[in-house]
């Protein structure tokens, strides 16, 4: 599949589904309610994967669930509809999903991780097994006066 084929595939899905495409300088964004995606031009396997992922936020499964589920659903949809899925695209998906887990762990325990055995972990490339959250890192609070004037 050539980059032009990839671009045409994304354009066809957008046309058929009534999704408006806006330019975006990096990564992508999507609005399911407004049926809009903002993406970089599709010129490679990675920009193709990202474009399909953003379309997955509009058309894919799990989009009304918490963020980690929605992200996994968008990648699942992208992988299923892609005309080709290369190792580079798989790596992009895996790195993105991994970054979402790190994001959730930093905000623990507010953010719900997908349960063990959920397809999220398979998409990430992690075998289903019990997982433990890392304990949240407590930030030491220092008063502004102490920062300005040091200890007294």
Regions found by a protein language model. Name each.
Residues 1-5, 11-46, 58-61:
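Active-site scaffold of zinc-dependent metalloenzymes
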Residues 42-43, 84-152:
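Long, well-structured alpha-helical subdomains associated
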Residues 55-73:
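Catalytic Zn2+-binding segment of zinc metalloproteases
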């Amino acid at each position: 599949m050539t980059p032009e084929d990839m671009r045409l595939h994304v354009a066809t899905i957008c046309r058929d589904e009534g999704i408006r495409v806006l330019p975006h300088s990096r990564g992508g964004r999507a609005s399911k309610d407004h049926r809009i995606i903002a993406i970089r031009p599709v010129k490679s396997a990675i920009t193709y994967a990202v474009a399909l992922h953003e379309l997955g936020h509009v058309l894919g499964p799990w989009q009304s669930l918490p963020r980690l589920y929605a992200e996994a659903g968008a990648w699942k949809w992208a992988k299923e509809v892609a005309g080709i899925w290369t190792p580079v695209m798989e790596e992009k998906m895996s790195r993105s999903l991994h970054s979402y887990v790190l994001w959730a762990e930093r905000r623990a325990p507010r953010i719900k991780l997908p349960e063990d055995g959920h397809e999220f972990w398979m998409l990430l490339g992690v075998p289903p097994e019990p997982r433990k959250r890392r304990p949240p890192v407590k930030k030491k609070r220092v008063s502004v006066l102490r920062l300005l004037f040091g200890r007294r």
